[in-house]
């Protein structure tokens, strides 16, 4: 069974750094969808093939989100990938607050502002959670808390938006090869531990997350809402 959906309007928030958001946007564009991406940077590291537009967007800026939303009367798929992590100092209150502001509050505000456009189509929202939605880590307490919040937010919004035929789901990646994980991959001990604990014996790739995203956005997932799919190569079951 091949998942293929064409001609839909997609917005992928947080797709400027050649990571998960970029892979999802690329997959959506390859299937003939109209895709717009955003990122915190002025320009993306590279523009995914087939993607129509890039907009710089700070998701802690309400006015900027509202300005972007004026471009959409209707939106079929919203993907929320924007997130930050501050591994060295997340225990500091101001840093903790900033991570929560971006990863949880910012993504929630994006959903709120684009809600009307998604209701217009009976659309699909895909949030990017994390295996840290379920696993603890002393080094990223703010990141883990924010991603646990995304998991619960997904469930709550799924209940709220179901009467409008809008589905809300999340994907919880494990260790994936991205710019954000570059430091960890360069640490030989950490890299070995990740590979040893992962039953598939490797780090995930952004494309490993794009496949489930395409499924959740498709009509084949029409009866799925409020779910968080863990995509971690089995890391969390070890």
What are these regions (language model features)?
Residues 2-36:
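Canonical Rossmann dinucleotide-binding motif of NAD(H)/NADP(H)-dependent dehydrogenases/reductases
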Residues 19, 135, 213-214, 225-238:
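Short C-terminal tail/terminal secondary-structure segment
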Residues 102-120, 158-159, 163, 218:
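Amphipathic alpha-helical dimer-interface segment in Rossmann-like NAD(P)H-dependent oxidoreductases
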Residues 130:
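Residue(s) in the substrate-gating loop at a strand-loop-helix junction
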Residues 162-167, 224-226:
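Short, small/polar-rich loop/turn modules that mediate ligand/substrate recognition or access, typified
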